């Protein structure tokens, strides 16, 4: 089930389940996971894109193995905030993945503008070699996307606790 609003997404999440963050590219999918308390995102792996059915099967395996409670997909908005063809492609991927997984797994989107730039900068600061950066950039970017969503979830929970 695809939910646009983060608060609705949070309400639909099962308790004590981790989330998976995805950074969709044309050739790869960066994958990151959170802890069960939804506080920290960790890069997991980069999936080499082939056919959708194979990609969906791999992501479905990760969801099942880790008993994940929801998915956060990076939404590649234009710098002015508008949605272009890449956003449409991401939304189509989410719809197809939702059908493919065939469960009531909540799916939401998170603005991924500059996530790859931030990931690249962090890897440069960590003095990572060019070869290693190329290997890990996608799942590190997925962790940045997921961490942004987790930070928003923390704010929503704090606001709910004050009410």
UniProtKB/Swiss-Prot annotation:
EC number(s) per entry: 3.1.-.-
Cellular localisation: Cytoplasm
A Pfam family of this chain: RuvX
Molecular function as annotated in GO: nuclease activity
Disulfide bonds: none
Record function comment: Could be a nuclease involved in processing of the 5'-end of pre-16S rRNA.
The protein, known as: Putative pre-16S rRNA nuclease
Species of the source: Roseobacter denitrificans (strain ATCC 33942 / OCh 114) (Erythrobacter sp. (strain OCh 114))
């Amino acid at each position: 089930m695809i939910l646009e609003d983060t608060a609705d997404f949070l309400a639909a999440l099962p308790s004590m389940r981790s989330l998976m963050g995805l950074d969709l590219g044309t050739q790869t999918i960066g994958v990151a996971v959170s802890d069960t308390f939804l506080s920290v995102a960790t890069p997991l792996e980069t999936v080499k894109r082939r056919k959708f059915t194979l990609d969906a099967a791999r992501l479905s395996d990760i969801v099942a193995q880790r008993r994940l409670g929801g998915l956060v997909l990076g939404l590649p908005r234009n710098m002015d905030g508008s949605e272009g063809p890449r956003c449409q492609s991401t939304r189509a991927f989410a719809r197809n993945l939702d059908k493919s997984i065939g469960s009531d797994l909540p799916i939401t989107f998170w603005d991924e503008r500059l996530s790859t730039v931030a990931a690249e900068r962090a890897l440069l600061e960590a003095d990572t070699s060019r070869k290693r950066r190329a290997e890990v950039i996608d799942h590190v970017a997925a962790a940045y996307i997921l961490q942004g969503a987790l930070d928003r979830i923390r704010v929503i929970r704090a606001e709910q606790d004050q009410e």
